[in-house]
Each structure stands twice: as C-alpha cells, then as structure tokens.
Design a protein with these regions (language model features):
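Cleavable N-terminal export/targeting peptides
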Residues: 1-30
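Transmembrane beta-barrel domains of Gram-negative outer membranes and organellar outer membranes
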Residues: 22-149, 162-164, 179-194, 199-201, ...
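Sequence/structural signature of beta-propeller domains
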Residues: 217-218
Length: 248
C-alpha cells in the first residue's frame, strides 16, 4: 500500500505543471532550510498534515494544522535574520499550549565569493509549556548550488539538529538529534515556477522524516507546496501535506 501511494505521488510530480523558487522562508518541506526572510518582508504560512492511515497500534492520528508568521529583521546584504511564531493544533492536550516561536540567522549563498555556501543557524519550536512543548530544536545548516556546463544540478544542503532530550524520544528513550539533508531544484526546463525537493530529518522521534514534494507558484508572492511525509518511526502513519505560503 505504501509503495502504491509513493508511486501515485511521483506520477503526480511528473504529470502536473507545479512550481516555486527555492524553498519557503523557513523550511524546505519539513526541516529548516538555509533561506532567511529579507528585511521587513513578512511570510505567512498555513500548513496541513493529513494521516494516510491509522498508526500501527490502530489509533487514528489527528490532522495537524500550523499557522505561522515570520519576518526578516536585519537590513544587511550579507547577514540576515528572521523571527516568527506558529500556532499549532492537532496534538491532543498539548493544544492548550499552541504557541511556538523560532529564530534564524543566515548568510546567503555566494555572499563572500562564488564558492561560499549558504549558512544558517537557528532554533525553532520554542514552546511555552515546560517539559511539554519546549522542544527547543537547535540546528545548523549549509547549502550550495552545483551546476555542470550551465546546467543546474540543484541545491544540496546538509546540517545537524538537537532538541530537548525529554521530549524528542523513541520508545521511551531519548532520540533528540540527527542529520538534516536536502536536495532541491527549480525545474527551469519546464517552468521557472516548478520546484521539487527531497528533504530528510534524522532520529526516530516525531521530528524524524523523509519528505518528497513539489510546489506551484501562483504569483510572485504566493505558492503552494504538495508533499508526502514518510516518518522514520514506522509505527506512525505517513501524512500528506499541503502548505500555502504568502510573502508581503
């Protein structure tokens, strides 16, 4: 069944003309990217994660919703920063504490020469309830675009994250750190608006997942990502995700 779902998703990627430029402001599909919002630019996101089936124990996972707002706060060309917050729901009793905050600082790709990668460090999911929602996921990431004879191979990103050891667990044991990996590419051969990505976050905590997706950019400031999330903990149901992003 899972293989049929993946085949359907990949056929959708190839069949439908969808798009975006590199990533959303804070994430690729799932994990943080090296992108940072420009100074005074606001970024509104509305994300949905819909389970494809029951968890392995037979329980039905809730649909997760996330409404977030981020803004760029540094007026420099070679050093950017953004701050933001998210309102999340679908986590049962944790919905009593729905607010989470994030901060990121980054240096754009090629800022100090053509071989210089994009760099970013940050923290996200800073919750307001101690030992319940204070996941406090710290990360660092580097990304670089490669090409051969003016043909882009896409951007490759690699990084590392670490979160709260009491909350990022698997089977009762801490599993709170791991790799961040991503490949993404704007498919200019088809359209400058067509963007695809494969995104990975390590661990078998609830943060660990492999994600595949594409995006369509409806206008200069509005885009929608369509993706599929394979959780590293195979006891958890996979999810479809739809994410709308608006810059203003």
């Amino acid at each position: 069944m899972r293989s049929l779902k993946l085949m359907f998703f990949l056929v959708s990627v190839l069949w439908f003309p969808v798009s975006l430029c590199y990533a959303t402001a804070t994430t690729h599909i799932w994990a943080p990217s090296t992108d940072v919002q420009p100074y005074k630019k606001w970024h509104l996101t509305s994300d949905f994660y819909v389970p494809t089936e029951n968890n392995s124990d037979g329980t039905r996972a809730d649909t997760i919703t996330n409404l977030g707002l981020t803004v760029g706060v540094l007026p420099f060309e070679k050093l950017n920063a953004e701050v933001g917050f998210d309102h999340k729901s679908g986590y049962g009793t944790l919905d009593d504490y729905p607010w989470y905050f994030n901060i990121k600082v980054g240096i754009p790709e090629n800022a100090y020469g053509k071989f210089f990668p994009a760099l970013a460090v940050g923290i996200y999911d800073i919750g307001i309830k101690n030992d319940k929602t204070d996941y406090n996921v710290l990360y660092g990431k580097a990304g670089k675009t490669f090409s051969i004879d003016n043909v882009s191979l896409g951007r490759f990103s690699v990084g590392y994250f670490k979160g709260d050891s009491k909350l990022l667990t698997h089977n009762g044991k801490k599993d709170n750190d791991g790799a961040l990996l991503c490949w993404e590419r704007t498919m200019t051969e088809i359209s400058d608006k067509l963007w695809v990505a494969i995104d990975y976050q390590g661990s078998r905590s609830s943060y660990g997942a492999t994600n595949v997706g594409f995006s369509y950019k409806f206008s200069d400031n509005t885009s929608v990502i369509f993706g599929y999330d394979f959780y590293n903990d195979r006891d958890l149901a996979d999810t479809y995700t739809v994410q709308m992003d608006i810059d203003f």
